[in-house]
Swiss-Prot record:
This is Polyribonucleotide nucleotidyltransferase. Involved in mRNA degradation. Catalyzes the phosphorolysis of single-stranded polyribonucleotides processively in the 3'- to 5'-direction. Residues 556-615 form the KH domain. Mg(2+) binds at residues 489, 495. GO terms for cellular component: cytosol. Keywords: Cytoplasm, Magnesium, Metal-binding, Nucleotidyltransferase, RNA-binding, Transferase. Its EC number is 2.7.7.8. The gene is pnp. Disulfide bonds: none annotated.
Length: 710
């Protein structure tokens, strides 16, 4: 296929798609140019069904530093593991694409997005999401798209689609929404305490804009789209399924209705093991035993799936016996740990998170050097999910995509209420350790983070709580669930996380397993989430009503002084010599910004005070009219040099020593003598003249004797 180009304008910027020129051996490939951002997307599919009980989809988003005209950092000067932003963008693209493949599809699919040029005012992630959908749609991969995504901002009561950098900085909302022509199927958002009505309207505005992008994709597919390949879907043997359902469905239903998680898991596992043992023995000599046992496992999973959904939709009974809108038992604790700067333990049913606060000087902020201009990140929220939290063994190592994503969600939820840098000049790190998990651990980490911040004396604007909403839908009827547990998440159709304060929403995240959800479901879920959020905030505020007025004794104290910008080099010294000497002497940490704000951190107030004195002395300047207690350091015939302070000397001319005539300076002064002087002049070169006699009352002039006349 020769190169073909398709052009439109979207959100005020040119959107150009090129097909047929590059990556022609992939099943589908596109080059998307949005503004001056350029993204190459290639989609490929394995020829055979993969083993395993899941769909092996891999979406990558690769940031090439050359795209922004930068050299990679580090010794190797080559791109390494994906940045946090790249990982989050890959997840952002994966989530709306994944539901658009058929049930039982098991071929491996890879979608690789490479950023070739970067324009900070034209969203490369949105170009990559568009390119991913289009590459799959024009390929022979059986993808039931297209989908598209947009960013939505909110400034002065107006919604803005794909805002540029300046607009995003002024926006009260940072929303990414994706979906198909019919419905929304992915949401990711941070917001500055916006109402449910505004958030819902933003979602609908975003979905309207998505229609333009989908229509554009459909035009391209009509011209260059390939015929979809016939692939084998994972389907179980119908006779085997009927046999197992008839014999064991009642037993499995009974096991599913056990309320306590561990007991329920044990009961369902016992039934499954009994069934597997029977059929493994029955077909032991069959050459297709592996396929049969795979089908048995899949049938049992489908039976459990069907019973959980039936209980909720028909009987309105949840696996643990709760009502549809009921939250599990809550508990909130502060000061769980000594020595740390703040800690909070939050428990919701069998989900538990411990959050630990650490405060540090601003010099500890994380420097982010990606495709965007380098910047410093003041607030970090890290989420850890050890396998013991679900009673299992498993991999331990660096944070995976899921942990990075959950940490980022908590970060967005909490950063909206943090004090400004001027109010609270600290770098802030929260670490969420998930100790138990039965669903919604990311929201528990938000609640625990609120407790830790307030216990640590961080003056947040308001406490934040999070809740996860679920959905069971048969296409006609649906049920929205409050505070979903693991089983409801696994067998349900939606995981909709909502975090916020009493004033409004600070973060949203939605993933679904069906093609999309309607505005009615979104509205109902947001309303139920608000009610639940307020219930959780009641528990948090009963434990700690407001941030403590003081930091923990172990937290670094801070004081700030302002110096002239031209004095920064004086405090730092040649090669940092002066500031290093101060730090070595006092044991403090010092940060100096470009405006001359000096922040001094230490747990010892006396050390802070001493540091302030040293710095004040370094930057101090003599002023005309001020009086100084000085020390004579040198004597010359024409006067004496005195030290006013630190490295600032002044000349007391011989004529300024006394009102009477001074013949020899050494007759009046000696080196090391303390004298009081007044600065009377500073010339253009900074040389200081001082006077001793200016501080002495001038003696009266002698009266003239009257002449006698004869």
């Amino acid at each position: 296929m020769s190169k073909q180009t398709f052009t439109t304008t979207f959100a005020g910027k040119p959107l150009v798609v090129e097909v047929g020129q590059v990556a022609k051996q992939a099943n589908g490939a596109t080059v998307v140019r949005y503004g001056e951002s350029t993204v190459l997307t290639a989609a490929v599919m394995s020829k055979k069904m993969a083993t395993g009980d899941f769909f092996p989809l891999q979406v990558n988003y690769e940031e090439k530093m050359y795209a922004a005209g930068k050299f990679p950092g580090g010794f190797m000067k080559r791109e390494g593991r994906p940045s946090t932003d790249a990982t989050l963008t890959a997840r952002l693209i994966d989530r709306p694409i994944r539901p658009m493949f058929a049930e039982g599809f098991r071929n491996e699919v890879q979608v690789i997005n490479t950023v070739l040029s970067y324009d900070e005012n034209a969203s490369a992630p949105m170009a990559a999401m568009f390119g991913s959908s289009l590459a799959l749609s024009i390929s022979d991969i059986p993808f039931n798209g297209p989908i598209a995504g947009v960013q939505v901002g909110y400034i002065d009561g107006e919604f803005i689609i794909n805002p540029d950098k300046e607009q995003m900085e002024a926006s009260l909302l940072e929303l990414t929404v994706a979906g198909s022509k019919e419905a929304i199927n992915m949401v990711e958002s941070g917001a500055k305490e916006l109402s449910e009505d505004i958030m819902l309207e933003a979602l609908l505005k975003g979905h309207q804009a998505i229609q333009e992008l989908i229509a554009f994709q459909e035009q391209i597919v009509a011209v260059v789209g390939k015929e979809k390949a016939e692939v084998e879907l994972l389907q179980v043997d119908a006779d085997l399924q009927a046999d197992i359902v008839a014999k064991y469905n009642a037993q499995l239903q009974k096991a599913v209705q056990v309320e306590e998680k561990k007991a329920r898991e044990a009961a369902t596992e016992a039934v499954k093991e009994m069934v597997k043992a029977e059929y493994e023995e029955r077909y032991a000599e069959d050459e297709n035993l592996a396929t049969i046992m795979r089908d048995v496992a899949e049938i049992l999973e489908q039976m459990e799936h069907a019973e959980v959904r039936r209980l909720i939709t028909e009987d309105k009974i949840r696996p643990d016996g709760r009502k549809i809108d009921e939250i599990r038992p809550l508990d909130a604790v502060v000061d769980f740990l000594p020595k740390v700067h703040g800690s909070g333990l939050f428990t919701r049913g069998q989900t538990q998170a411990l959050s630990i606060l650490t405060l540090a000087p601003m010099g500890e902020t994380q420097i982010i050097d990606g495709l965007a201009p380098e910047y410093k990140k003041r607030f970090l929220h890290h989420y850890n999910f050890p396998q013991y939290s679900v009673g299992e063994t498993g991999r331990y190592g660096a944070a995976g995509r899921r942990e990075i994503g959950h940490g980022a969600l908590g970060e967005r939820a909490l950063e909206q209420v943090l004090p400004s840098l001027e109010e609270f000049p600290y770098a802030i790190r929260l670490v969420a350790e998930v100790l138990e998990s039965n669903g919604s651990s990311s929201q528990a980490s938000i609640c625990a983070g609120t407790l830790a911040l307030m216990a640590g004396g961080v003056p947040i604007k308001a406490p934040v709580a999070g809740i996860a909403m679920g959905l069971i839908s048969d296409g006609t009827n649906y049920t929205v669930l409050t505070d979903i547990q693991g089983l409801e998440d696994h067998f349900g159709d939606m995981d909709f996380k909502v975090a916020g304060t009493r004033e409004g929403i600070t973060a949203l995240q939605m993933d679904i397993k069906i093609a999309g959800i309607t505005p009615q479901i979104l509205e109902e879920a947001l309303a139920q989430a608000k009610k639940a959020r307020f219930e959780i905030l009641d528990v948090i505020e009963a434990t700690i009503a407001e941030p403590r007025p003081e930091l923990a004794p172990t937290a670094p104290k801070i004081d700030t002084i302002k110096i002239d910008v031209d004095k920064i080099k004086v405090v730092i010294g040649k090669g940092g010599e002066t500031i290093d000497k101060i730090i070595a002497e006092t044991g403090v940490k010092i940060d100096i910004d470009d405006e001359g704000n000096v922040s001094i951190y230490s747990s010892d107030q006396a050390a802070i005070n001493r540091t302030k004195e040293i710095i004040a002395g370094l930057v101090r300047e003599a002023k005309v009219g001020e009086v100084y207690h000085a020390k004579v350091v040198r004597i010359e015939k024409f006067g004496a040099f005195v030290n006013l302070f630190d490295k600032t000397d002044a000349l007391v001319h011989i004529s300024e020593i006394a009102w009477t005539r001074t013949t020899n300076v050494s007759d009046v002064l000696e080196v090391g003598e303390d004298v009081d002087v007044k600065v009377i002049k500073i010339d253009e070169k900074g040389r200081v003249d001082a006077s001793m006699k200016a501080l002495i009352p001038r003696p009266p002039k002698p009266e003239k004797k009257e002449e006698k006349h004869d």
